[in-house]
Amino acid sequence: MPVITLPDGSQRQYDHAVSVLDVALDIGPGLAKACIAGRVNGELVDASDLIESDAQLAIITAKDAEGLEILRHSCAHLLGHAIKQLWPDTKMAIGPVIDNGFYYDVDINRTLTQEDLDLLEKRMHELADKDYDVIKKKVSWQEARDTFAARGEDYKVAILDENISRDDHPGLYHHEEYVDMCRGPHVPNMRFCHHFKLQKTSGAYWRGDSKNKMLQRIYGTAWSDKKQLNAYLQRLEEAAKRDHRKIGKQLDLYHMQEEAPGMVFWHNDGWTIFRELETFVRMKLKEYQYQEVKGPFMMDRVLWEKTGHWENYAEHMFTTSSENREYCIKPMNCPGHVQIFNQGLKSYRDLPLRMAEFGSCHRNEPSGALHGLMRVRGFTQDDAHIFCTEEQVRDEVNSCIKMVYDMYSTFGFEKIVVKLSTRPEKRIGSDDLWTRAEDDLAAALTENGIPFDYQPGEGAFYGPKIEFTLHDCLDRAWQCGTVQLDFSLPGRLSASYIGENNDRQVPVMIHRAILGSMERFIGILTEEYAGFFPTWLAPVQVVVMNITDSQSDYVQQVTKKLQDAGIRAKADLRNEKIGFKIREHTLRRVPYMLVCGDKEVESGKIAVRTRRGKDLGSLDVNVVVDQLLAEIRSRSLHQLEE
């Protein structure tokens, strides 16, 4: 006689085993109709699964995050159903859920085109519109293997042979004549899977191994209603317009080429943005009392063995050798900073010691994962490490948090999601040490009035951490900032200081990054601003233009005055119509265009126009210089009179 306890604390008793759907129906027909699955004692189960003993139950609907994920997973099965009807010889590999959608890897004897995707999507809609029931059957390992062997599904057979225990009972999900294998749960009926869109295809090696066969990966998105689907597709359309790779080419910021995969060739205008960003960070480092250091970009492998990186991270490290010694090109800056700390005897009076670097790092990312500035092999970290005592941890974390929000607000990021990752099962250090560290991080967030979620068990083995995730104008999440405590690395590299009692103690190390990778952050900003960088960041801040040759000398005088004031200005004296020049520089997203005609020459003024098309009228040149300097120095996100 199971007693079912619901989230509101109410209970329902039954004299026989009941399914999740039975309980939902008992509560009300509306909930039964919306029921996708259940969470029984914290574990997700199918709506058809039986509950045989006392349990805590939550009904999962499409409004829940888990419900949407289940719906997307079932759309992957729907894709399998449709593709097997259209091209029966296709062999199905894996079809998991990903952010905002799903994919399925398939082995098919044709190169899928956009026309094929349209045909496939149409068949998926035809099948989903039948609102058929999805039937789950738990079978023996052998029965599952026989089922897929008979259907010629070699990849499913391989999964069973290599990944699933012979004692297990896999779940087979029947979509009419189509059968797929999954841990589940899945939707009970295809009425939940009406709002989807197939997006693109790509190549993918079986099991991610380039030695295996190349499959075709079909990507799709799915949502619980049409409004959400359309909103997402609109966001994708807007994201495509803002793609930093496209804008980077339009604005001549940088390029990449095959001879240096994942490495950035910065052009003049892109490097101007980089240096301006670097200047801003330097100003903040001075304000928050950091030293700036510079470590070598490669060090002997022996050092990386001491840190544990060689054991755990070697596949991501580039190496080289010279004179019978092997060197690793650094993937991160922390070991180098410990070496600097170790030079000379340190006292507790020297702590906290805040050490920052614009560190040039390299990581051997898979070529298929590289993506413009967002995922590169060579990058610059705005990295810092704070060496302090245990008693100083809270104050230092507090300062890091203030610095994070101070810097993010300059760029206009207002929605920041914060997570605190706590001790994992495998860790170093005593429970007391972890408790104090976690409490210090939580207290620092609370003192700053910052809401956060815990991520239990997600901390590194050497300490808990805070993660800061930015949400941009399209509500995309970018994890950039981290504050990570480290109880391990200083000890591994023999870092110590003389304590108040004249004994040697190991400092606590705080890893702190705010922008993360400078390259990636510039990519994020490019998409956030759609290339319309605020004036202080814009590569060219002002273009001064003549209407006819008679104003050329005046244009050059005005341009020099702006340049002498420290404004990035250039003159456009080309023999082109003024409308053509304005259009060209507007497309280049230059913040201000100053136009000189005979009237401006006579009056000593200048006609001011913004890249958004706003005419500010004719203004005195000195007034323009002063106003522009005020906007630039304040790092305003807004132009004059906005």
From Swiss-Prot:
It is an enzyme of class 6 (ligase). Keywords: Aminoacyl-tRNA synthetase, ATP-binding, Cytoplasm, Ligase, Metal-binding, Nucleotide-binding, Protein biosynthesis, RNA-binding, tRNA-binding, Zinc. Residues 1-61 form the TGS domain. It comes from the Bacteria. GO terms for biological process: threonyl-tRNA aminoacylation. Its EC number is 6.1.1.3. Zn(2+) binds at C334, H385, H511. Its cofactor is Zn(2+). It catalyses: tRNA(Thr) + L-threonine + ATP = L-threonyl-tRNA(Thr) + AMP + diphosphate + H(+). It is found in: Cytoplasm. InterPro entries: aa-tRNA-synt_IIb (IPR002314), aa-tRNA-synth_II (IPR006195), aa-tRNA-synth_II/BPL/LPL (IPR045864), Anticodon-bd (IPR004154), Anticodon-bd_dom_sf (IPR036621), Beta-grasp_dom_sf (IPR012675), TGS (IPR004095), TGS-like (IPR012676). Binds 1 zinc ion per subunit. Homodimer. PANTHER family: THREONINE--TRNA LIGASE, CHLOROPLASTIC_MITOCHONDRIAL 2, THREONINE-TRNA LIGASE. Belongs to the class-II aminoacyl-tRNA synthetase family. This is Threonine--tRNA ligase.
